[in-house]
Amino acid sequence: MNHPDFPPIGDPQLKLEALTHRSYCNEHPGTPSYDRLEFLGDAVLGFVVGRILFERYPHFTEAELTRLRSQLVNQNQLAYLARFLHIAPEIRLSQSLARDDGQSSPSILADVFESLLGAALLDRGLTAVEDFIQELFVPILEQWEKSQDGRSPKLVPTMDVKSMLQQWALAKTKQLPEYELINTSGPPHAQEFTFTVKVAGKIHGQGSGPSKQIATKQAALEALKSLGLLQ
């Protein structure tokens, strides 16, 4: 899935603030962190996504709308989007947190996604932020709708975990993940497949499912969790 570009933030100081983790501020006293902008971004994201869902699904109950919104904007989903928008390299962290690969932390990535939304709101206005959120989340909903019965939100909108793992592996090791079928069980009409996934020769995840596609996705998901990229 292609993602739109983040609204450009013309004020360089505002953008720097949106990218600054509080650990960086401990080493650079007087530097503002992204916490206040994250608060603002969280509020506008919840509002805009809530309105999208309200208008798109008039037959959903309040509880269903609330559940779907929480699935769309949870930490893992926002961290996934932040990675594909290439936000991580710009985040300012303390030296120790940077050495520990803090830019890959799902919580930090999700926080910075929201803080940049807050900065964009102040710099570009509500319309630009609304347009960006629409462009970002409506395709996710359209993909999700294809697997639904049109009556209730039964499934979480899924992230492309295999693409996420591939991007991480290429960035860190310059190698593609390797999936290996290690077991097939069950009768021909109800088979169960089990795959492992390796990165740079090391097994990081294993998954099973009724199809090879589902099994490899599960393996990728487990690998992302073991690497600390998802929680």
Swiss-Prot record:
Its EC number is 3.1.26.3. SMART domains: DSRM (SM00358), RIBOc (SM00535). This is Ribonuclease 3 1. GO terms for molecular function: double-stranded RNA binding; metal ion binding; ribonuclease III activity; rRNA binding. The gene is rnc1. Belongs to the ribonuclease III family. The lineage of its organism: Bacteria, Bacillati, Cyanobacteriota, Cyanophyceae, Synechococcales. Gene3D superfamilies: 3.30.160.20, Ribonuclease III domain. Residues 1-125 form the RNase III domain. The active site is at D42, E114. PROSITE patterns: DS_RBD, RNASE_3_1, RNASE_3_2. HAMAP family: RNase_III (MF_00104). Homodimer. Residues 160-229 form the DRBM domain. Its cofactor is Mg(2+). InterPro entries: dsRBD_dom, RNase_III, RNase_III_dom, RNase_III_sf. Keywords: Cytoplasm, Endonuclease, Hydrolase, Magnesium, Metal-binding, mRNA processing, Nuclease, RNA-binding, rRNA processing, rRNA-binding, tRNA processing. It catalyses: Endonucleolytic cleavage to 5'-phosphomonoester. Its main location: cytoplasm.
